[in-house]
């Protein structure tokens, strides 16, 4: 799998201390080229539909020329490690915190200014100040309101291992966001509890789907009672069909894990000043409101509220165990556990 390959590359790069730089015998190449601060190279695990408009706005406001390499978050992180000191990337915009944590642990990210870090709660950025969350992506249990009453739903994600939920659950075990959740479950509750949960859900004969969207669509048709998803998929569907009989349920534990999409400036950045301005831009009020209204994610900069019928981040913080999101990089052991329990 792509994610497994990514973890192996991280380990290799960390052990070897990076890749060697090729030498050039041309003496004219020994002088460093002047930095052009109106240029920026971004490796983005967020697709163009999600951030393309903001990239255009940043270019217009700064008169900068932005080159964006879009792709899978894990593959791009692997590319940064493989490219070593020759990587053209200035900024890495990751779909999840795990990849950011992996690059930090490999020594590929730099300390961000305190003025930037202070804009986001410490729960959603690197404790060492090496990356920062831009938006929050919350795990929820969505449910069909015609099949389940709100008061029937357990306050803990472990409550869904109860046999009364047999045949009523939808999940997507091969989906990256679900695997990140299982990693968070391992970090917060330990290996044995995570194993118990996976085995308990599997014993309840859950319906298997490829992704979050298909789960929410199945819930809307009454094909399942509850499903484990990220919050914004329902928000997007309700934008076009507000009468869909599906609502969010936020458990009072790691079941409401807040993962982040975030950014880091690389230690090989050729354009560090414009890179910092890019991070500042993604955290400004305009960009944060764009994410809240267009992608339905949680804005992480202080003072900007989420859209829709969502719990506040403050409420979610008090419910879910706080973990260092950088530790969500250990997907390899998550995949091993999921294989061991025959979930994948």
What are these regions (language model features)?
Residues 36, 41-65, 237:
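Short, polar/charged alpha-helical segment
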Residues 192-194, 297-344:
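An extracytoplasmic/periplasmic, membrane-proximal ligand-sensing/linker region
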